[in-house]
C-alpha cells in the first residue's frame, strides 16, 4: 500500500473541512475513527504521516474512552518510529488542564490562580482562598462545557451539594479565579508546524461555550468588533511578546498544531488558560484573510508525506571504486 496521511479522530463533523482541503490537493488520506475503528497492535503499522486530532471533549459525544484508546495507538506508532503530528505527549496536554498549567508555569507564562480539586470537600476548602468571584472548570473538557461562575463560597456550596453538580469525567475539577477581561474578548493564537499562523479575537460577552468550528457557530451573534455579526475575527498585524514562549512550550511537548487561548485582564496582563491540540477554524472569519487554517494543515501534512515518500524512494547509485581506496 502506498503511503497515506492517517487522521486519528472521533468527530466526523470536525473533519469535514480537512477532508475538503486534502481532496483539493489530491492528498491520499485515511481516517481512523477511535469511536468505531479497531486497530490490531499485533501488526506493523502502515507507513505514512499520522495526524492526531483526539479531543478532550470526546466523552460528550459518546466516546468516553477514545483518548485512552488513542494513547494506545500513539504508543504503538511511536514504538515503530512513525511520523506523528501531535504525539502522545501532546495528547497528555489535551486531556489535562493540570498538565497544561504545569507547562505554562515551567515557561513562566501567566495563568489564573487555580486549585485542582478531587472532591466536593476540596472544592469548598479551596474556595476560602478567593475573596473575589471564581469559576469551576473540568480538568478534562472542551468548548467551555461545565464551567460555572460563583460570587462566593455560599453559592459554590449550593452547587456542589445540589442536583446540578457536574463532576469532571476524570474526577478532577478546577477552582479558578475569574479574570474580568478588558475588552470582553478572548484571543486564540493558532500554530501550525509549531509556527504562528494567526490570532483570532472571540467575542466572549455571551458566556463560556466558545468553539471556532463552523458547526458550533451556526447562529451568528453580534460581535461589536465585527460588523458581519460573526463572533470570530482574525486580528490584523497581530503581535505578542509571548509567542516565542508559546512556541517553546508546544515544541517541547510534541505539539505541532495547536490553538492557545488567553484573555487580557483589567490589569493589562495576559492570562493564558487553555491549550487546544485539537484546533478548529472559523470559515467566516477566514473569508476576510488570506490565511486559511485547514488549507495550511492539509498542505503541511502533504508536504510531510512527500518528504517521507521521497526519502524512501531514494537509493544510492551503483558506484565502483578502485580496490586501493576501499578500507
Where are these regions (language model features)?
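Conserved anion/nucleotide-ligand pocket segment
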Residues: 131-159
Amino acid at each position: 500500500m502506498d503511503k497515506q496521511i492517517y487522521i486519528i479522530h472521533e468527530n466526523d463533523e470536525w473533519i469535514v473541512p480537512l477532508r475538503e482541503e486534502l481532496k483539493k490537493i489530491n492528498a491520499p488520506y485515511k481516517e481512523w475513527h477511535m469511536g468505531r475503528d479497531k486497530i490490531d497492535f499485533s501488526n506493523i503499522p502502515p507507513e505514512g504521516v499520522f495526524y492526531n486530532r483526539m479531543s478532550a471533549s470526546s466523552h460528550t459525544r459518546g466516546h468516553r474512552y477514545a483518548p485512552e484508546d488513542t494513547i494506545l495507538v500513539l504508543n504503538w506508532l511511536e514504538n515503530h518510529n512513525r511520523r506523528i503530528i501531535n504525539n502522545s505527549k501532546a495528547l497528555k496536554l489535551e486531556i489535562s488542564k493540570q498538565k497544561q498549567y504545569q507547562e505554562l508555569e515551567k515557561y513562566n507564562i501567566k495563568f489564573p490562580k487555580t486549585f485542582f480539586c478531587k472532591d466536593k470537600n476540596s472544592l469548598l476548602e479551596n474556595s476560602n482562598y478567593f475573596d473575589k468571584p471564581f469559576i469551576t472548570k473540568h480538568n478534562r473538557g472542551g468548548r467551555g462545557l461545565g464551567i460555572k461562575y460563583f460570587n462566593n463560597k455560599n453559592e459554590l456550596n449550593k452547587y456542589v451539594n445540589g442536583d446540578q453538580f457536574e463532576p469532571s469525567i476524570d474526577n478532577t475539577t478546577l477552582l479558578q479565579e475569574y479574570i474580568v477581561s478588558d475588552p470582553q474578548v478572548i484571543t486564540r493564537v493558532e500554530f501550525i508546524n509549531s509556527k504562528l499562523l494567526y490570532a483570532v479575537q472571540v467575542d466572549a460577552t455571551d458566556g463560556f461555550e466558545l468553539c471556532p468550528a463552523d458547526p458550533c457557530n451556526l447562529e451568528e451573534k453580534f460581535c461589536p468588533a465585527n460588523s458581519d455579526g460573526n463572533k470570530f475575527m482574525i486580528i490584523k498585524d497581530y503581535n505578542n511578546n509571548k509567542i516565542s514562549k508559546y512556541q517553546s512550550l508546544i515544541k517541547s511537548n510534541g505539539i505541532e498544531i495547536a490553538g492557545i487561548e488567553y484573555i487580557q485582564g483589567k490589569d493589562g496582563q495576559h492570562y493564558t488558560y487553555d491549550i487546544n491540540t485539537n484546533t478548529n477554524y472559523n470559515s467566516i472569519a477566514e473569508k476576510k484573510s488570506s490565511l486559511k487554517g485547514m488549507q495550511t494543515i492539509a498542505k503541511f501534512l502533504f508536504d510531510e508525506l512527500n518528504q517521507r515518500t521521497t526519502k524512501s524512494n531514494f537509493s544510492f547509485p551503483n558506484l565502483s571504486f578502485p580496490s586501493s581506496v576501499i578500507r
